[in-house]
Amino acid sequence: RLGKTAVSSVGGIPVPPVVRYIAGYQAGAKAAFPTVKTLNGYSQDFVAQDKCKNVALSQLAQGSAVVFQVAGGCGLGALDAAKEKGAWGIGVDADQYYVNDRVLTSAQKKVDVAVFTAILNQVKRNVFAGGSNLVFNAANGGVGLGKINAAVPADEVAKAKAVAWQVHLGKVDVPTTCANKGC
């Protein structure tokens, strides 16, 4: 309900991890509201908050109701822009709910889960897979949602959690690239 007309994303640089976040966000928005317009832009920076703020302000001027920042520290500028214009923001990596009262939630990398798993594998299981990577995703608890803003209606929270659970179970295929070169 919060972004039925248009939603947007501000990426730092279009590298694969950033594109995957944006692809999932756009697919989720389209699944919830098939006619929603999705906007995307890049700041070409992960640090300078003014660059992300400018990208977000442009998107907000085009009608975006929700801005998802996928630009590290630069993205804090996008969250500021959302608040400034009375729109909503979504944080990334860590729980950015604390940034301002217009942050809906955050797409979190659960680094604690990765660290705990690596330690558990070594200490309890005596397994050290040197030279290989552990991959964390929704299915193994490696990513998830941060705190959800109280402004989000309870029925919408329930729907979001139900979809997140379906992703966790592997029943929802989350795209890793955007349709029509949208990101």
Regions found by a protein language model. Name each.
Residues R1-C183:
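A residue-level marker of the well-folded mature domains of exported/periplasmic proteins
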